[in-house]
Regions:
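Hydrophobic, aromatic-enriched alpha-helical segments typical of multi-pass transmembrane helices
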Residues: 1-172
Length: 172
């Protein structure tokens, strides 16, 4: 990734670094649906799931913003600095994926238990379950594996939120 990023323009690196936190904010707005879909007696669990997911995606936005360093510092061949950044991001990713994993697992469990207005089949399309399909995207034909596999976490959100909007409209 460093070899690719260090060839990018400064403008693209700055823009890419800023997109992460902005996207995190938008995801937090979207995560509010976790409160809206909960049956009334389980609202507190919806709020907990909302806050866990928000914290995870905020850490993810910060993680994304640090990727600009791969290009900004990488082009100057500061190997020691790059090694520190790689180590730091290696630690930070556990917070991102850990928190998001807990939040997504909670959502899947809530759907299966019938705590939400979502039909139980939505479990199959919940982000935590779709995430496990990531290894299959690497088996797609060349071109598709990059278009779909490279942006799989984005596709997860597109699939889930499209179906969530439909089911919220139909079942509410």
């Amino acid at each position: 990734i460093i070899d690719i990023m260090k060839k990018e323009s400064r403008k693209r690196l700055y823009t890419g670094g800023i997109i992460g936190p902005v996207a995190a904010f938008l995801y937090c707005v979207g995560y509010y649906h976790l409160v809206l879909i909960m049956n009334e007696q389980y609202q507190a669990w919806g709020w907990i799931c909302f806050f866990v997911n928000c914290l995870g995606i905020i850490c993810g936005g910060a993680y994304h913003s640090h990727c600009a360093y791969f290009g900004l510092i990488g082009r100057h061949a500061h190997e020691e600095s790059m090694n520190e950044i790689v180590k730091y991001l290696g630690v930070q990713k556990y917070f991102v994926f850990g928190l998001q994993g807990i939040g997504f697992l909670a959502l899947a469990v809530f759907i299966v238990l019938g705590w939400t207005i979502m039909p139980r089949w939505m479990f199959c399309f919940s982000p935590g379950i779709l995430f496990f399909l990531a290894p299959l995207t690497r088996k797609l034909p060349k071109g598709l594996n990059i278009a779909i596999g490279g942006g799989w976490t984005n596709w997860i959100s597109i699939i889930y939120y499209a179906l969530a909007l439909i089911t919220m409209y139909v079942y509410k």
